[in-house]
Amino acid sequence: MNHARDTIAAVATAQGRGGVGIVRVSGPLSGQLAQAICRRELKPRFAHHGPFYGEQELPLDEGLAIYFPGPNSFTGEDVLELQGHGGPVVLDLLLRRCLELGARLARPGEFSERAFLNDKLDLAQAEAIADLIEASSEQAARNALRSLQGEFSKRVHALTESLIQLRIYVEAAIDFPEEEIDFLADGHVLSQLDGVRADLSTVLREAGQGALLRDGMTVVIAGRPNAGKSSLLNALAGREAAIVTDIAGTTRDVLREHIHIDGMPLHVVDTAGLRDTDDQVERIGVERALKAIGEADRVLLVVDSTAPEAADPFALWPEFLEQRPDPARVTLIRNKADLSGEAVTLQTSADGHVTLSLSAKSADGLELLREHLKACMGYQQTAESGFSARRRHLEALHQAEQYLEHGRNQLTLMGAGELLAEDLRMAQQALGEITGAFSSDDLLGRIFSSFCIGK
């Protein structure tokens, strides 16, 4: 559908000086603005070189003008692009001329919002535009481009279609009880439901990797006092971010460093040494450390390799801890290899435990750790397999997963087809929030307001 509305204008290029600057216009007055500024009729989708005029035929600049009649444009509306010189004064003069002729200044993200409202792209694709602009690594940029091209949306639509087909079957059985379809006896519903859950789990895992590449991975360095945690933080940061002494308990609070590995963002957190203590200040530091561990994407459990310790990371956590992190997101760091004489190695056991021997002091093995962290973020994905995702996408996928699990329990434990049908509907609605099929105005406002002006 085409949303007839006022005409908007904005500078579409980054602030500052450059060789080229672009003013973008969208809305029903775009054609009139083109005629007034260029003083001639523009052939659609052709680049026209010439002066850009202000009042009283006073030239403001010269460059290329391109007119895109709707609906075959980015926003689905009539669009005008004026590509002139990239000086801020010149661009401001050109933008002010557009406003004098009836346009208004666009809000941040309003061009992309109109493209979404006019069905030119869905919400996940619109967000991918911002992700592509803000990408901090080559792989993050590739993933954002694939999302912009619809790869993530395609996966979500496939899940939604499977849910719709399952809902049709379940609701038909409920509406026509004379058919006497036994949900459990024929096995069709459970089989289809488990298939959707498996597909959803795959998409959720890949979306999680995409979110890490976009937002960065939170890595928490944990362990007992004097294991070398702060030395490891300093080695990764490349500077003296934390105080290092031989006194146990030097670090009493969490320290955060934001670093990049080959352009990939990492949020590294150093924590207080984990031990049962009567010192009130140190106990607060331990509590904050445990909170950080629970929120981490990856935990580096640092142990002193010169001390006789067990090799199982789960057994290495202090006995007083009531809850310990999932071993699947823990890397055991056997530090001080320069003192113990251990070889610098990265090993993965049969049960999936990852152990890395290194020396934070000498930096031996540090490159192995960097490569390992990159792999945890999905750096080794092929260009054909990744897509960009955001935290809100993960929340929606998790919601859908919970609804499907709840619906399965309702069916298998109670034989409640009506309750299953409602859970299927809610799961479909959760998926729809990703692409914008089900989205409140408040959600749309928050998303598009985070965009650049002119996008």
Swiss-Prot record:
Gene Ontology annotations for the cellular component aspect, listed alphabetically: cytosol
Its EC number(s): 3.6.-.-
Major subcellular location class: cytoplasm
Binding site residues for Mg(2+): 230, 251
List of residues binding (6S)-5-formyl-5,6,7,8-tetrahydrofolate: 24, 81, 120, 455
Subcellular compartments: Cytoplasm
InterPro entries: G_TrmE, GTP-bd, GTP-bd_TrmE_N, GTPase_MnmE, MnmE_dom2, MnmE_helical, P-loop_NTPase, Small_GTP-bd
Subunit structure: Homodimer. Heterotetramer of two MnmE and two MnmG subunits.
The protein's name: tRNA modification GTPase MnmE
Lineage of source species: Bacteria, Pseudomonadati, Pseudomonadota, Gammaproteobacteria, Pseudomonadales
